[in-house]
Amino acid sequence: NNGDDTLADLGKELNFSVPTVTKMVGELIEDGIVMDFGKMETPGGRRPNIYGLNQSSGYFIGVDISQKRVHIGLINFKGDLIDEQMDISFEEAHPHERFERLCEIIEDFMSHTVVPKDKILSIGINISGRVNPQTGHSYSFFYFDERPLTEMFEEKLGIDVSIDNDSRAMAYGEYIKGRVQAEKNIIYVNVGWGLGLGIIVNGQLYYGKSGFSGEFGHITAFENEILCHCGKKGCLETEASGSALYRKFLEKLHNGQSSLLTQQKENEDEITLNDIIDVALQEDILAIELIEEVGNTLGKHVAGLINLFNPELVIIGGTLANAGDYLILPLRSAIKKYSLNLVNKDSSIKVSKLGDKAGLLGASLLARSKFIGLI
């Protein structure tokens, strides 16, 4: 996790023999990626050498795409975030236009960031929905060409590019730089406009056969006849997500219920998901009630995940996590009510430490790990 270490400790962490680790580290030193920081101070006996990452040997960009916004950041080789740009407008409708717009955003960021382009080794891009990181295809967004999306990005940007699912990247960001301490079995619940999971088993990201794992929002959970964007009806996402909260909030306004937002916005079309969360934090009764409803519904199904996976840690992240206790308290209560007592005792429930930066950090850290062959 980006610290300095001895060869013996690295071998234990990676489950490799010391000779294997010695060979690997030697190659990384030759490439300028790892540095030998000299002897470790010990009370007696033979003093081992300490090795660590050369933070200026290269840089990685992470791109996190949300519903209508893009976050982008730059890390050094040690994983420190050294530049970022949040909430860049991203509203083009056609997949090809969105692709071109995203390339413009990345190129603009590279032209103004604090390091020269030739020091940027790789770019990681988060995309929601079905993403196959191995082949470089995205099947939910930017799907306008049979070629791998990564290949098209590389042609346009002139730099190595990898893609991954947004929830999985967020989980990885928390694992390396966020809420995770010693835990190895983790579920990250991304409650944004949609609903997804990032799953870590025995310290490794779980992808499934084609990288499509974590489609939590598309479990059939209701007989509500609400059409999900996936084309099916009754998905969990239709009642427990940011889009569900947004839909319910507007329905209540149409039915005559009042909110602080009816005073703040002349047109209902101007209301955003973040606006609803903001007024909840200002004690808007309607917003609070609906967020609590989402938390309770979500908690019932997270209870099922706990029964199924027996994780050490469940992290709640994504846009709705910004609602704090209004989401988390009913969610915790439902988990306790609907999960098996003996199983849920093993699981801590925590809110994301990285917040809105989990995606861009996860994307850049994944780009780094893929570049050096850890994933």
Label the predicted regions.
Residues 1-86, 90-118, 157, 223-224, ...:
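ATP-binding/phosphotransfer module of carbohydrate and carboxylate kinases, centering on a glycine-rich
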Residues 76, 133, 200:
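Short, acidic, Ser/Thr-enriched surface-loop or helix-capping motifs
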Residues 182-240:
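Glycine-rich phosphate-binding loop of actin/hexokinase-like ATP-binding domains
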